Amino acid sequence: MAAGAGAGSAPRWLRALSEPLSAAQLRRLEEHRYSAAGVSLLEPPLQLYWTWLLQWIPLWMAPNSITLLGLAVNVVTTLVLISYCPTATEEAPYWTYLLCALGLFIYQSLDAIDGKQARRTNSCSPLGELFDHGCDSLSTVFMAVGASIAARLGTYPDWFFFCSFIGMFVFYCAHWQTYVSGMLRFGKVDVTEIQIALVIVFVLSAFGGATMWDYTIPILEIKLKILPVLGFLGGVIFSCSNYFHVILHGGVGKNGSTIAGTSVLSPGLHIGLIIILAIMIYKKSATDVFEKHPCLYILMFGCVFAKVSQKLVVAHMTKSELYLQDTVFLGPGLLFLDQYFNNFIDEYVVLWMAMVISSFDMVIYFSALCLQISRHLHLNIFKTACHQAPEQVQVLSSKSHQNNMD
């Protein structure tokens, strides 16, 4: 009883930190049902590989464990590459690129079968969907940084900046249109195609050397590295045109609003603020903080992006409003204030402070979120409740995208 009283008398900020969702949000979360549609170009042939791979996954392995393992592999392999190429202008040993290619392929494979494992073990839940998308938000950042290093985009800082943040923007838009329409839509060119393309970039860098991307194409007089950038840009335009077609044509809420009854444009404030802050700090830096430490800079803002994306997913699943105020902006805010006061503290030191603050804030929020939902739904995050045979799981329509459905 004393313990309960102590918990009840805890400061409001502490309760908000340990329990991010309100009682009303938790109730609406119980009613949430995963809804997705669309099949990308590479999904049909890869389904054969994913189905084969699933046979080797033991029934006792929880879907969230598969997701986390894939993320860990992707993060670790990318960090190895970053350690050799902190400015994305260096050339790393060939094996680091192969390691990143393998790490990304493993991540893609495990990310594709976690939903299949959930249905196989009858453990589909809102927690699994949230965990999957939350890990994807962070993986997006590491994929962008790793691929940019492989193509030596650090020699063109503006390209490095553009490719990294546009990658985050596309991921955010995918969930933005989900918040508006209530359904996650996959296009013909989607995340699977991008991941396979990045694996190819890593392999080419391994066998041709990262400097191969600096080769000038005769007649065209452009660097070879611009070709993957243009291909990526084409995919971005294709995907974003589809996303904004859904967003601008109104949502499923009252009077064409979002699933939470808010403006369909409101989520744009969050990603817009991240990008504007990143551009301002980059361009106003007296010490060229981005040019000298691009990977650290992108990772810091990537943590901010990951948390905001996680909150957007939560807003969709709980049909609630997405608020702009967030402690995760403290990190970029420190850099902004340091520039305002003429770099009173060394900008590199402040960048590291911002990285620590943003990463801890993101991890603490996501951990508290998963723990609160697991307690409310009486689920274990990394254990399956039962081992149900595959034939007992309902087969969904082939028109629905099932890869990431937990």
Curated annotation (Swiss-Prot):
GO cellular component: endoplasmic reticulum membrane; Golgi apparatus; Golgi membrane; intracellular membrane-bounded organelle; membrane
Topological domain ranges for the Cytoplasmic compartment: 2-62, 119-125, 180-190, 249-265, 317-329, 377-406
Catalysis: reaction(s): CDP-choline + a 1,2-diacyl-sn-glycerol = a 1,2-diacyl-sn-glycero-3-phosphocholine + CMP + H(+); 1-octadecanoyl-2-(5Z,8Z,11Z,14Z-eicosatetraenoyl)-sn-glycerol + CDP-choline = 1-octadecanoyl-2-(5Z,8Z,11Z,14Z-eicosatetraenoyl)-sn-glycero-3-phosphocholine + CMP + H(+); 1-hexadecanoyl-2-(9Z-octadecenoyl)-sn-glycerol + CDP-choline = 1-hexadecanoyl-2-(9Z-octadecenoyl)-sn-glycero-3-phosphocholine + CMP + H(+); 1-hexadecanoyl-2-(4Z,7Z,10Z,13Z,16Z,19Z-docosahexaenoyl)-sn-glycerol + CDP-choline = 1-hexadecanoyl-2-(4Z,7Z,10Z,13Z,16Z,19Z-docosahexaenoyl)-sn-glycero-3-phosphocholine + CMP + H(+)
Residues that bind Mg(2+) 1: D111, D114, D132
Binding-site list for CDP-choline: N64, R119
GO biological process: CDP-choline pathway; lipid metabolic process; phosphatidylcholine biosynthetic process; platelet activating factor biosynthetic process; regulation of cell growth
Chain positions with N-acetylalanine modification: A2
Subcellular localization: Golgi apparatus membrane
Active-site residues (renumbered): H133 (proton acceptor)
Reported cofactor(s): Mg(2+); Mn(2+)
Tissue and organ distribution: Highly expressed in testis, colon, small intestine, heart, prostate and spleen. Also detected in kidney, skeletal muscle, pancreas, leukocytes, ovary and thymus. Weakly expressed in the brain, placenta and lung. Overexpressed in cancerous breast epithelial cell lines.
Residue intervals on the Lumenal side: 84-93, 151-160, 208-222, 282-293, 340-346
GO molecular-function term, one example from the UniProt record: diacylglycerol binding
Catalytic activity, EC: 2.7.8.2
Sorted UniProt keywords: Acetylation, Golgi apparatus, Lipid biosynthesis, Lipid metabolism, Magnesium, Manganese, Membrane, Metal-binding, Phospholipid biosynthesis, Phospholipid metabolism, Transferase, Transmembrane, Transmembrane helix
Topological relation to the membrane, as annotated: Multi-pass membrane protein
PANTHER family, alphabetized: CHOLINEPHOSPHOTRANSFERASE 1, ETHANOLAMINEPHOSPHOTRANSFERASE
Name of the molecule in the record: Cholinephosphotransferase 1
